[in-house]
Amino acid sequence: MRLIVAFFMALASSLTVAQEMTEMRSEFFYCTLNDGKTMEDVREQSKQYGEFSKENGTHYTQAILLPMHAGETDYDYITWGTWPDGKAMYEEWGSFANNYEAAAEEVTGGAAGTCRNSIATFFNLVARIPMDAAKRDKKSPVQFSRCSLNEGVTLEQVAAQEMENVKQMEDAGFEGLAIAYHVPYMGFNETPDFDFVMNYYWYSFDARAHAAQNYGAFAAENPEGQEAMDELVSCEGTSSFVFETMFNNLPDTEG
């Protein structure tokens, strides 16, 4: 079955508490629009690269993030790309480096944006609550928070507790949520002052609204989940964005 919400569904059927987390790879480019260009130009050029990627058989998916509540920023948008593993990452980069120059010349009007900062992460999908495809939004909300492990705690311990908490949320009627952890990989100018970034993705704004309205009461009735997380990890600096998939050339998967 073709992945609909690319990287948030790719591992969902295989992850369990007992398993070691399977790492995908992500990259983030922080970009500003060039003079006379709009986000429609950005979307069009991304989709054109998606066609190139598809023709060359590389396994890569790309999305655009627009700041929603992200504080003062020095960029207009973020391009977020993901591969299923490290092998696919370097195969796609090799295709881009060696073959895309000629294809890029066919893009009329020049580049839509200038990207001045780029980072790569190890991307671990931890847990998700499904939602019917018909109920999902084309553009959906995501949040990122910087997190530090408490002394002696491992990421696997945090993920195991996260899975328990998300299962409890699902049993309580929440839906349309995926949670992933991004561990710094490359491109960070200084040693990060955090261990990982927690990434919440909602499949629709209605799902996010339901969580905003009901999570407080749920947490009050089930305090043990958050208390357990507080013993493992500390998170701060939450920012929110609008997420929109541009293309998805990840391989077919079951689940």
Describe each model-derived feature in a short phrase.
Residues M1-I4:
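Positively charged n-region of N-terminal signal peptides that target proteins for export
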Residues S13-V17:
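N-terminal signal peptide c-region/cleavage motif recognized by signal peptidases
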Residues A18-G225, D230-G255:
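Short S/T/G/P-rich N-terminal loop/turn motif that feeds into the first structured element of a domain
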